[in-house]
């Protein structure tokens, strides 16, 4: 199968692969040429058909991750601005693109607006993203089975495998909670504390340190705070009430009893909803996010900040009482109705919670705990490898480096962050498509685009800490891959690029399944290539292909083409950093 077919494109992508959105003026620009030519080839940069730069390509040989023979094109900084740029080489011409200082402002806003469109428990009006995306409130009182306004605990015996194993060991609870609100996690109706935790933390980080590094686009800080508060208030509702078993812990998730078909809009969901057993991981996510929220909202809303900090401290105490209550892998059930988000190594979650509480309070006990963690500087855990919902140590270390505190070893923490960024730049330099994601086994993981973007947040943090432009330059080049400089020549962000994906796995952005419904909104990031191709659609279409080609833009390909809040969150950070990365060219 050709790369174009794998991407679901009706025409072949041009052999010159470039960021389809464009480049920033004054920042080194790059592209990749697909060719089996052995020697260097001439290239030309065109603006409205007029040549404005030229040079020779650099042969890079066979890129195993892409399954292609390639050259790289290093254009250097461009001091012009315009919308009609293209690169020509070896008889091929790239898709047109722009060079503008404000290139990423629209993407930053769109990536953030995605969260508003994922809101549960509230009507989405046409003013948010247009009439096509307007919908009634989902999972509210009056919805089938009562929605999320009065949710019971999962009854005992509802999580028994075919082998007779009860994943929750007989657990249930007599309490019911109003867990209205929050974000739908992905393309289904589940809401998960561990995925919400890292996502809201990164939106808070966009306020706390991204906004201190570059000026945010107009109105974005207000929108960031509004979205963060929406999720934080939901996290607080997920706590087990006083007097119940596991009081103070956070329920791991609230979800449907069974998977719903595509399409199913939130307000039409017919499934009963249940609270799943609390987990230590979910609780520590709540602790960390609430403590960070207490810092961010301290000036704007001291009362809300105090509520968040009180909840963080109380739930931390509850986690100490139940340090190893793990969420099971519910995927082993025949029809689980929700993702498991299971995790057996909580060292990073404990570190993250202690870090955020220390940064919020200066508490010496939390300082002792974070310094004793395997995830702290000098410890055995490489916290910056594959930052994700299941590996949050790197996020904690970045916040410890970026947020002012009295930490005695602050210089060592900051040095560890910049050293990680240097390693990322070194990896990036070896990749002909300019991205820093290069697993040792050559296989791309689930959500590879999210993992890549989290590596870029490390570069952004290093740029914030040092002001060195090489980190900014690496940040910009890494984004090229997401927006079209890849083996398939596809932009993985809907509405941004000439060949952007538009059939991501979703139950309500489901135009492919029902033409009356919309495609995913502008700014929605696809999870991207996944070597495992775990769903039947991608397995049949692209299974076994080179890593970068293990992707298809199909609504049924949930293993490679889903949308989730935790992948869009680093997109918000990176796009916001790039939106303020340069001043307009003169």
Task: List where the protein language model places each region.
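Helix-capping and short linker residues that terminate individual alpha-solenoid repeat units
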Residues: 211, 240, 298-299, 320, ...
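Carboxylate/His-rich catalytic cores and anion/metal-binding grooves
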Residues: 223-246
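Aromatic (Trp/Tyr) and acidic
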Residues: 17-91, 101, 111-197, 201, ...
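Short coil/linker segments at helix-helix boundaries
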Residues: 205-230, 267-274, 292-309
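Hydrophobic, small-residue-rich alpha-helical packing segments that form membrane-like cores
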Residues: 313-317
